[in-house]
Amino acid sequence: MSAKQPRLPLLGEITAPDGARLTVRVRARDDDAGAPVIVLLPAMGTPARNYLPLVRALHRRGMTVVTTDLRGQGESVPVPARGVRFGYRDIVEHDIGAVLDLVDTAYPTAPRLLLGHSLGGQLGLVHCGLFQPAGLDGVVLVASGSAWYRTLGRDGARWLVRSQLSALGAGILGYWPGERFGFGGRETARLMRDWARQMRTGRYTVPGARVDYERALRAVTLPVLAVDVENDTMAPPTAVDHLCAKMPAARVERLHYACADAGGRPLDHFRWIRHHGGLVERIGAWAERVVLASDRAA
């Protein structure tokens, strides 16, 4: 998707203690102050602007949609380079919470959901377990599973080798030039090490983390809609199930999004963003049934 496409209106900007800056944008339901707010966390190496077709569809379904880039992508600064050091810990323990605080201030009475794609969903869940954000009502995972190579079927060994070589290369170069290798976008060496470690071990183990991230996942109690996508070799059903199994206290509902649900259009780890026809309606229906009904009862 071209960067020349119109940008969403600005909701605010966030500056981290280390000087990193995130831009938060919103497509608001100005006609309904109580409309549910969905906060979209992108996949690794994927700018938030790539999700504009999905944002528009969710907005038409009656939701206010908030977007931000994962650190190092899109409008965020700094760009990963030699000497720029951040990883999973910075995103989990600062960035996601700062975005949710901004949303809480802007929409204090509205129901709020996280929608995480791939890495965005994984790190969003860890944040939820670690901080138990009071204003959050549920989490939607789409094409978001554990990156453990044993969950990736026949492609697992190839992904394991790729991940370890990527982390090694990033360590040598001081960053990962994913745009040159066709995978992952431009990332810091630290983030690539975090990703490669989880790929190898199946565990979210991050040096210097506030607590054990595996323990944080076990503390998630929110409603979770976990969607696997047909033809997705990067987050197949086994990978999604492995991530969900880490949250025994969560109220997890599983859903398979098939090409037939998308009107026969092709799907994979990224194509669902454009071919979202049947998925947006299911997300909206789940939110109304599980999350909004709970809010009304309270």
Descriptions of predicted regions:
Residues 1-28:
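N-terminal cap/lid segment of alpha/beta-hydrolase-fold proteins
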Residues 43-46:
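Active-site glycine-rich loops that stabilize anionic/oxyanionic intermediates
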Residues 48-50, 55-81:
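Conserved alpha/beta-hydrolase
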Residues 85-104:
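Alpha/beta-hydrolase active-site loop
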Residues 115-203:
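Alpha/beta-hydrolase-fold enzymes
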Residues 220, 226-228:
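Short beta-strand/loop motif that positions the catalytic acidic residue
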Residues 236-246:
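Short alpha-helix in the alpha/beta-hydrolase fold that links the catalytic acid
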Residues 253-298:
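Catalytic active-site module of serine/aspartate enzymes centered on a nucleophile-bearing elbow/loop
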